[in-house]
Amino acid sequence: MQAVQPALAFLEPQFDPWVFRVVRLGLPWWLRWTKGIREVRLEGGEILAEWMAQFQRGQVRLILAYRHPTTADPPCLIHALANLLPPIAQAKGIPLRQPVHAHFMYDRGIPLWAGAVAAWLLPRLGATPIVRGRLDRQGLKAARSLLLDGPFPLAAAPEGGANGHSDILNPLEPGLAQLGFWCQEDLLKAHRPEQVIILPIHTRYQYLGDPEPAIAKLLTRLEQDCGIQADSGLSIRERLSRLGEQLLPQMEQFYSQFFPKPLTQALGSGDPEVLERLQRLLDSALRVAEFNLNLQPQGSLIDRRHRIEQAAWERIYCLDEAGNRQSPVEWGLANRIAQEAQLHLWHMRLVETFLAMTYPPHSPAPTPIGEAESALRFWALISRLKGQDPLKLPTPQLGCRRASFTIGDPVNVSQRWGDYQRNRRQAVQSLTDDLQQALMQLMHSH
């Protein structure tokens, strides 16, 4: 980032059937060659087909709440809806109109790293953006409108973003539950009889072959980057742990030595617990960014990361029409503010990727997919420490994978309307908790 940028425009959803047809036909090949996903499965597809048919008949408004371990989840789910669900419905005698699709909610920051193609394509697939870290009235209004009147169900990840772990479910954000209640409110105001239904969807990946040789090769590269002597006698789990043991004290020293003591003093406590040390490191990294962006460290790590991102964006993407008439000095100062905001944002990105270290010491039964995900998160972390942006690099392919979606039992939002009228906050939290439990049960059953 060398200069202040134009303000982020709202990317209005404008579904284009012709673009969708091309994407539907090309997705299987794109997933195979760019993501290594050779197969997509839809388990419990007859449940989804029945609810999709009810949606198309005008009986329900439908929310697809899917687990979000990787950035490949939305394209895989689009493929499952468009190409796998219609044959399942036909076999069960359930009539479905084409196209079978969903309006996906996505983070407004995705086109910033995915590029102009994503900024052009996502709206034409009917996707709707949301800005993290602040009350995005325009984004919420668009999502609320699509949920009420859109031609397709609304699909969203209640975790708020990809967490990189198939076996760890992040705490759910309350926004999806709130959207469900808003939709019920809008239906009642319009005297419409539809019910609001949330379908939980579990997402999981499996390697079709043994990924261990590819993981070992990637770990050798990462060990070289960290100055660690390779030891082929160690297991994958041991090598992952060794990477964490190397990086954690290195980053503790980095923050305690080069940043103000009030922000990093907790790092010197000598607590022997790795997880506690990691949490203190993440807190210190966020405090550095918050201090420089004039923010108070309030809320969870996720809330703090969102606020940091939004504060940095306000300094970077702030150029309006009047900006073209700034003096050279004003222009130079605006560029300086944008450059420094980008530097402060680096600490938040580091926290996002440093969570890789939580996997090796705390999973009693490592799985191939879990070890592969941990290796990839270490790759993302080390890439960022080397000054690269892992989002703009090709992700190492560790083998061919199968993506599977499992449809859970529906959650009826309309039946909770009385609870919402009595206590809105409690009803939203209760619905969020029940959705979390439903996704946890799906995850543990596979």
Segments predicted by a language model, with ranges:
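Membrane-interfacial terminal anchoring regions of lipid-handling membrane enzymes
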Residues: 1-100, 108-109, 114, 132-133, ...
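Domain-scale detector for complete catalytic domains at protein termini or as standalone homologs
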Residues: 119-132, 146
